[in-house]
């Protein structure tokens, strides 16, 4: 089962992953930002055995749950970082209750996050950043409304 570590970009997700990684996995008390066992989902690797066009949002989203089903075959709890929301594209969802054990939702003070969104998404000013943040047609973590964040 998957526990999602979900947040806006620049909200402390990496810090929380380092903390959880140290708590759950790393007994050496050494923190290595380049060796965090809690990784991003989705990665292109997750879809490597599927013959799909990763740039086609419908093909991609219709296979997210297929990939999560494979990840969950051993029934162990896994934590994945994501900037994607619990959303649908057509009749397909990013995830579902069968694959999800829970969510850790990192929330940052909105007075700080608008600055991060402005810089992260290269918005010209705070008004443009606010418009981007409140646009229901935008997919968090994407540069356009037709793509989601895939690493």
PLM region descriptions:
Residues 1-151:
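PAPS-dependent sulfotransferase catalytic domain
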């Amino acid at each position: 089962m998957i526990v999602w570590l979900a947040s806006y970009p620049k909200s402390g997700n990496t810090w929380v992953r380092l903390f959880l990684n140290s708590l759950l996995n790393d007994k050496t008390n050494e923190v290595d930002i380049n060796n965090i066992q809690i990784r991003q989902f989705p990665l292109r690797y997750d879809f490597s055995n599927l013959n799909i066009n990763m740039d086609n949002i419908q093909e991609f989203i219709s296979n997210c749950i297929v990939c999560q089903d494979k990840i969950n075959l051993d029934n162990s709890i896994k934590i994945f970082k994501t900037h994607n929301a619990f959303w649908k594209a057509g009749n397909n969802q990013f995830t579902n209750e069968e694959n999800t054990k829970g969510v850790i939702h990192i929330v940052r003070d909105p007075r700080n996050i608008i600055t991060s969104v402005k810089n992260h998404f290269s918005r010209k000013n705070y008004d443009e950043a606010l418009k981007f943040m409140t646009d229901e047609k935008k997919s968090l973590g994407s540069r356009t409304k037709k793509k989601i964040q895939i690493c």
